């Protein structure tokens, strides 16, 4: 192995912009039944209402937090050491894994332009004939520390939050999901055992904080990062990781296709508190020089084991792109738009053979269960434009993904299923309905969908519309789209804009489903707005810094943050100020009426 550059990731590259606590937030930890279960949350302390509004205390709000230790001022951050190995003791206690001989080593002949991670741990794998998946544990009736961690995280101090809701909580329509059920460790276990949720935690990624993906839980979002052959570096991608989780990415997919894929992934995994997904076919193709015809099952198998040893938590596998389905795409306007799907279609044609990922699927399962890597069954034939939505090719593949889901479950492997794509609004619900029927309620994970094709540069908006809808119908995780979609590799600002758009979509979906704690944040912000508690409004926002900046563009003085108006209406035309005056007058009239009545008596 020939290393040609110095360490690219000094700690100082993570600026305060990336690591400082979010405005108005405090990192807190809630301890579970054992001292090493410490669940992070972001607490927003609220100011009291003024005397005019009752003078009451406003209780703090605990919010779901994905940022890891990076926003904890007490934490020491050193990218070269990686994050604390949060789950290492839990994995050891189960005594069902062994230290494995390193399966993959970078060949001496390969020129590496970035150094390996300096303290990479030895990989572990399952003991012979043992499955070490959360699905296996759940089916055995075992509630793991990971499951308890998830239950506390999803519950979000729900009892306190719901009790303090000021307004009426809307019931919502969950389309058959169980969103009102209290989230207990036993509920988490049962959902995983039924295959309706996954807890993606590779035994070789002990740094990850357990989270869950399923339609009976909070709607999650994924952010894609990764180097390309033309731009970006390991340093930039690690910074994108930290930036993405700061704003709320629940998982990360490393879609690197350039040089140093192995090293890039190692740096990301060792510094990621959220699950990391990949598409192994990209690296497999790099190994054969980019020649699709040279791909083989053996190359893919070795690549999958390499990534499992590093700690990848879930992998996209395009095993549903069958040879017989390829002609169904011939009449499409944009053909096959999935990179992985197009690679496998080309391989099938070149070899006049069936997709090796399909024919070797049970062998894939045996690898996955030895590390607890979850399947993200790829929709290689997803529609790439509105014209191709809901066509025969898309739904033929979906039926195969349903078959593969049940095969994976038989091997105790966790599964979620990927979905489109580009779909007009009136066709979105059919996608959710067909997936639930074909895939036995396995979690659905969709890219958008984009609801129109006319807005390059704004596809984070066109897709967030579809994401909110399909999230309401039951999609468990939404893959973000950035403004750079179809145009280029996203930078930090693009990542931020994509995540905020998708946090809005996910939260809107949770509100529509009637998630018990979802409305609490809306009510708290609305109350702060009506009472002109400007700082609380900023702090409760998805993007506090932007809310503050936009307010201060026209009213920058500190006194303006106590004013009962904004620059939109000014002091004379503020509807909320006038509404309060109406309320005060009505209260006085009622009081006067009561007094007069008493006097008459």
Swiss-Prot record:
GO terms for biological process: thiamine biosynthetic process; thiamine diphosphate biosynthetic process. Its EC number is 4.1.99.17. Its cofactor is [4Fe-4S] cluster. It comes from the Bacteria. The keyword Cell division does not apply. It catalyses: 5-amino-1-(5-phospho-beta-D-ribosyl)imidazole + S-adenosyl-L-methionine = 4-amino-2-methyl-5-(phosphooxymethyl)pyrimidine + CO + 5'-deoxyadenosine + formate + L-methionine + 3 H(+). Substrate binds at residues 224, 253, 282, 318, 338-340, 379-382, 418, 445. Binds 1 [4Fe-4S] cluster per subunit. The cluster is coordinated with 3 cysteines and an exchangeable S-adenosyl-L-methionine. [4Fe-4S] cluster binds at residues 566, 569, 574. It is an enzyme of class 4 (lyase). Keywords: 4Fe-4S, Iron, Iron-sulfur, Lyase, Metal-binding, S-adenosyl-L-methionine, Thiamine biosynthesis, Zinc. GO terms for cellular component: cytosol. One of its GO terms (molecular function) is zinc ion binding. Pathway: Cofactor biosynthesis; thiamine diphosphate biosynthesis. Coiled coil: none annotated. Zn(2+) binds at residues 422, 486. Catalyzes the synthesis of the hydroxymethylpyrimidine phosphate (HMP-P) moiety of thiamine from aminoimidazole ribotide (AIR) in a radical S-adenosyl-L-methionine (SAM)-dependent reaction. PANTHER family: PHOSPHOMETHYLPYRIMIDINE SYNTHASE, CHLOROPLASTIC (PTHR30557:SF1), THIAMINE BIOSYNTHESIS PROTEIN THIC (PTHR30557). Belongs to the ThiC family. Homodimer. This is Phosphomethylpyrimidine synthase. It comes from Xylella fastidiosa (strain 9a5c).
């Amino acid at each position: 192995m020939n290393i040609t550059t110095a360490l690219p990731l000094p700690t100082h590259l993570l600026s305060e912009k990336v690591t400082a606590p979010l405005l108005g937030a405090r990192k807190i930890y809630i301890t579970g039944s054992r001292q090493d279960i410490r669940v992070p949350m972001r607490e927003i302390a609220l100011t009291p209402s003024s005397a005019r509004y009752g003078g009451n205390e406003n209780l703090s709000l605990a919010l779901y937090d994905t940022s890891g230790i990076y926003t904890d001022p007490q934490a020491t951050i050193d990218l070269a050491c990686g994050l604390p190995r949060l789950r290492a003791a839990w994995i050891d206690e189960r005594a069902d894994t062994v230290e494995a001989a390193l399966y993959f080593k970078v060949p001496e002949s390969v020129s590496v332009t970035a150094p390996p991670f300096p303290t990479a741990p030895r990989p572990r794998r399952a003991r012979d004939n043992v499955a070490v998946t959360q699905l296996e544990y759940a089916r055995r009736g075992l509630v793991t520390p990971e499951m308890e961690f998830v239950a506390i995280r999803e519950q979000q101090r729900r009892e306190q939050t719901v009790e303090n809701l000021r307004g009426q909580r809307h019931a919502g329509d969950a389309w058959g999901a169980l969103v009102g059920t209290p989230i207990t460790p036993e509920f988490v276990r049962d959902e995983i055992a039924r295959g309706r949720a996954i807890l993606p935690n590779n035994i070789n990624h002990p740094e990850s904080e357990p989270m869950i993906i399923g339609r009976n839980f909070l709607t999650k979002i994924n952010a894609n990062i990764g180097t390309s052959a033309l731009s970006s570096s390991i340093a930039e991608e690690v910074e994108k990781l930290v930036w993405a989780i700061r704003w709320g990415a629940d998982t990360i997919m490393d879609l690197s296709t350039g040089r140093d894929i192995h090293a890039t992934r190692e740096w990301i995994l060792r510094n990621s508190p959220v699950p990391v997904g990949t598409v192994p076919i990209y690296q497999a193709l790099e190994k054969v020089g980019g020649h699709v015809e040279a791909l083989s099952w053996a190359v893919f198998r070795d690549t999958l084991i390499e990534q499992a040893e590093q700690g990848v938590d879930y992998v996209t596998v395009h095993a549903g792109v069958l040879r017989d389905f390829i002609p169904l795409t011939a009449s499409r306007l944009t053909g096959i738009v999935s990179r992985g799907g197009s690679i496998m279609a080309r391989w099938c044609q070149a070899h006049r053979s069936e997709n090796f990922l399909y024919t070797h699927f049970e062998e894939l399962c045996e690898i996955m269960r030895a590390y607890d890597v979850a399947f993200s069954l790829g929709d290689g034939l997803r529609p790439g434009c509105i014209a191709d939505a809901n066509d025969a090719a898309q739904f033929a593949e979906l039926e195969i993904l349903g078959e593969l889901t049940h095969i994976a479950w038989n091997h105790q492997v966790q599964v979620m299923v990927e979905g489109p794509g580009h779909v007009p609004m009136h066709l979105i619900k059919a996608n959710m309905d067909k997936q639930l029927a074909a895939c036995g309620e396995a979690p659905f994970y969709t890219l958008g969908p984009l609801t129109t094709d006319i807005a390059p540069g704004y596809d984070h908006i066109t897709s967030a519309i579809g994401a909110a809808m399909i999230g309401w119908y039951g999609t468990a995780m939404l893959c973000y789209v950035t403004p750079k979609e179809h145009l280029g590799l996203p930078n930090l600002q693009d990542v931020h804009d994509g995540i905020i758009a998708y946090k809005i979509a996910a939260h809107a979906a949770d509100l529509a489903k009637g998630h018990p704690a979802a409305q609490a944040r809306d009510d708290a912000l609305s109350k702060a707005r009506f009472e002109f508690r400007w700082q609380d409004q900023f702090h409760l926002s998805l993007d506090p810094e932007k809310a503050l900046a936009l307010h201060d563009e026209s009213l920058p003085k500190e006194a303006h943050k106590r004013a009962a108006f904004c620059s939109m209406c000014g002091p004379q035309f503020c509807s909320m100020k006038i509404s309060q005056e109406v309320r005060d007058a009505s209260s006085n009239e009622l009081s006067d009426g009561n007094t007069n009545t008493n006097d008459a008596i």
